[in-house]
Amino acid sequence: MSYNFTGTPTGEGTGGNSLTTDLNTQFDLANMGWIGVASAGVWIMVPGIGLLYSGLSRKKHALSLLWASMMASAVCIFQWFFWGYSLAFSHNTRGNGFIGTLEFFGFRNVLGAPSSVSSLPDILFAVYQGMFAAVTGALMLGGACERARLFPMMVFLFLWMTIVYCPIACWVWNAEGWLVKLGSLDYAGGLCVHLTSGHGGLVYALILGKRNDPVTRKGMPKYKPHSVTSVVLGTVFLWFGWMFFNGGSAGNATIRAWYSIMSTNLAAACGGLTWMVIDYFRCGRKWTTVGLCSGIIAGLVGITPAAGFVPIWSAVVIGVVTGAGCNLAVDLKSLLRIDDGLDCYSIHGVGGCIGSVLTGIFAADYVNATAGSYISPIDGGWINHHYKQVGYQLAGICAALAWTVTVTSILLLTMNAIPFLKLRLSADEEELGTDAAQIGEFTYEESTAYIPEPIRSKTSAQMPPPHENIDDKIVGNTDAEKNSTPSDASSTKNTDHIV
């Protein structure tokens, strides 16, 4: 027995009655297969962020950052189902181009109609874009490392995705978005993902204030990553997932998708080499693993808005410029006394801006055309003698930056004025560590006595003894380290260069 499909897809609502209409006939199955695989690949970036952030933190906060990445995925995916997708990608924004309607509230009617910006069905496009939302949320939380309460963090993330991420996603990716109509180009999220997460994390860090550090009370706290192995593994996951992140943003399985993957890999390689070489000459003639990983991620951030628009050779320039620019931004952060402990702003905020400007310079009409009939033509950037494009890119940067900083600040300050939504841990909790104070579990149990307990016991790990010494300081923070040799110091320098 088989279905008797006699209906024709309507292109509206659900796309037609699935009992009488084969909704798949209007779509290319190869395109759907590729974007489905890419959706799963993008999600791998979420635990990659968790491993990266956890490795860069101190041991007593390591589990909380793994927890935060998975929590961000859960909160963002629910928010995307609840109303996020509708606010960003509803087919009808009622002409405002600023934010969508509740047309798809609770995924109502999200099924087989063509999505607003691609030849994919709504349901598949919603899945793919939901992974982008999860990655953005996980990245942004890096600004709160080692000093934020976790329940207010969850509340903040849900609200931030609603009033910051979704409007900007509508501006840059919805067919009716005002930046789309202006002519601003953002292939895979230089503005929507990286600028918003970087500057959102910056505001979070500023409002929380710097971490308590009895050794450097007047200076900025600096700590060595407790696990460079986790940093490397997280970077591996991110680089792997980024190929799906940028390759899938083509929206189809055309030459443009594979072209953008090659550009992505080349920019990552050049960014990593640039950062590592800069650190080698600045910091005691030692090769730094954390610097290499930071540069790779900076290169990936820089190519994100550009990958499907620019020639492959320009990925070398984008990787080098973004790697160098983000490296310098880490120093700027220290000069401005901003305790952005995981460099969310220095790499994602700054890197997203650099990549967006370079997109306006290197965008080429012939690269965009490799998607064939699936894409609308563009005028290109400076290399096509379309000099207005950089102006359009700057307009997008200024608008997204102003909205992100203003709305995030208002949201966090309002929450912090509500007693049960206070943002920051107490001084005692911060000294104990977020893992013990807020979770009651630990990444490493070597300092605790083992007592068998059922898996659902109220306390699933023993409380560690109080810390007698300040742990994980980098060179220059303790008297013992002041007497270290230059070669000893160089092995620990600049480990605050992080994503």
Curated annotation (Swiss-Prot):
GO molecular function annotations of the record: ammonium channel activity
Biased composition regions of type Polar residues, renumbered to the chain: 483-493
Effect on the protein of changing G349C: Circumvents the requirement of the CTD to enhance substrate trans-location through the hydrophobic core
PROSITE patterns found in the cross-reference section: AMMONIUM_TRANSP
Impact upon substituting N368Q: Does not affect glycosylation
PTMs per UniProt: Phosphorylated at Ser-457 by the TORC1 effector kinase NPR1 under nitrogen-limiting conditions which causes a conformational change in the C-terminal region (CTR) to form an open active conformation. Supplementation of nitrogen source leads to inactivation and instant Ser-457 dephosphorylation via plasma membrane PSR1 and PSR2 redundant phosphatases.
Compartments, record wording: Cell membrane
Record SUPFAM superfamilies: Ammonium transporter
Region Enhancer domain, residue ranges: 428-441
Biased amino acid composition, Basic and acidic residues: 468-482
GO BP: ammonium transmembrane transport; nitrogen utilization; positive regulation of filamentous growth of a population of unicellular organisms; pseudohyphal growth
Region of interest called Autoinhibitory domain, as start-end residue ranges on this chain: 450-485
Disulfide bonds: none
Keywords: Ammonia transport, Cell membrane, Glycoprotein, Membrane, Phosphoprotein, Transmembrane, Transmembrane helix, Transport
Presence of the UniProt keyword Nucleotide-binding in the record: no
Membrane topology: Multi-pass membrane protein
Glycosylation sites: N4
Notes concerning its domains: Within the cytoplasmic CTD, an enhancer domain, limited to residues 428-441, upregulates substrate translocation via the MEP2 hydrophobic core, while an autoinhibitory domain, comprised within the 450-485 region and including the NPR1-target serine Ser-457, counteracts the action of the enhancer domain. In between, a linker domain, limited to residues 442-449, appears required for optimal activity when the kinase is present but dispensable when the kinase integrity is altered.
NCBIfam families linked to this entry: amt (TIGR00836)
The family this protein is said to belong to: Belongs to the ammonia transporter channel (TC 1.A.11.2) family.
Purpose of the protein: Transporter for ammonium (both charged and uncharged NH3 and NH4) to use as a nitrogen source. The affinity of MEP2 is about twenty times higher than that of MEP1. MEP3 has the lowest affinity. Under ammonium limitation acts as an ammonium sensor, generating a signal that leads to pseudohyphal (filamentous) growth.
Name of the molecule in the record: Ammonium transporter MEP2
Source organism: Saccharomyces cerevisiae (strain ATCC 204508 / S288c) (Baker's yeast)
Lineage of origin: Eukaryota, Fungi, Dikarya, Ascomycota, Saccharomycotina
